[in-house]
Amino acid sequence: MVGKARSSNFTLSEKLDLLNLVKPYVKILEEHTNKNSVIVEKNRCWDVIAVNYNAIGVDRPPRTAQGLRSLYKRLKEYAKQELLQQKEAQSDYKSSISEPTKKVVEMIPQISSFCLVRDRNHIQSTNLDEAAQAGTSSLQVMVDHHPVAITVEVKQEEDIKPSPALVSSPQHNDALEQQEEHELMRVAEGSVSPSLSSVDMRMTSSPSSVPRRDVFHQESGEHLRSLLRCDPQVLQMLKEEHQLILENQKKFGLYVQEKRDGLKRRQRLEEELLRAKIEVEKLRASRLRRDLPEYSSF
């Protein structure tokens, strides 16, 4: 399939000739590093390859070293794609790939291993995508078949009382501590347990009912206040923490004020320096006028 050479495309014979010229320099050209000496050596090799390529045939259009380098990169990429397609199709190696690809594989055997690694990564990513898709579909099925949640609404009554677990009994300290731990766990999980006399089980929400969040804040606040009343050490720690916060805020305020004053002083000094420079320039100008002969005659 050797046709007439054009200015922008390469024929099959031109591609094969380029690969034959590149073959002695493959070791240098395939060294992937940013060393200056290697880059200079690569440029020198491409200059030599371009000279030898243009000396092959007179009827061919002249090619630059940059154009030949771009063609070489395209041939390598095309060889990788062709090997991947050949592996996916599981066809005969010799009959399915083109001559430039065979030449590239002979020159650079590691391209075949690259294609194997890329194919393995593609298979792994496909399996991961299928597993994620299956997990998403199963989660969607679980959401679709989830039963309707029954909301617990508390009637707006004035006789809402705290939970019985909040009442402290001096005779059962251990039992009280266990109850308080269970209550803290329940409050942390957001569970509300009002008395059964004030609970109305309904399927629809009512705008006149008290939200569960208000009940949660009420119970958690009362429980924390009861804990604070029972433990003076916690009160002392909270007091010290509050004092530290106030001291830090005071120090930060002083720091901000000092920084603001320092900026003001700096601005004032810069203004004074600028005025002094203006005065100096005025004095220089007056001295120059006095020293010049044309001004002194006046």
Swiss-Prot record:
Encoding gene, per UniProt annotation: Fsbp
Self-association state and partner proteins as the record states: Interacts with APBA1 (via PDZ 1 and 2 domains).
Native organism taxonomy: Eukaryota, Metazoa, Chordata, Craniata, Vertebrata
Localisation per UniProt entry: Nucleus
Cellular component, GO annotation: nucleus
Species for this entry: Rattus norvegicus (Rat)
Composition bias, Polar residues: 192-209
A molecular function GO annotation: identical protein binding
Pfam families named among the record's database cross-references: Myb_DNA-bind_5
Protein's name according to its UniProt entry: Fibrinogen silencer-binding protein
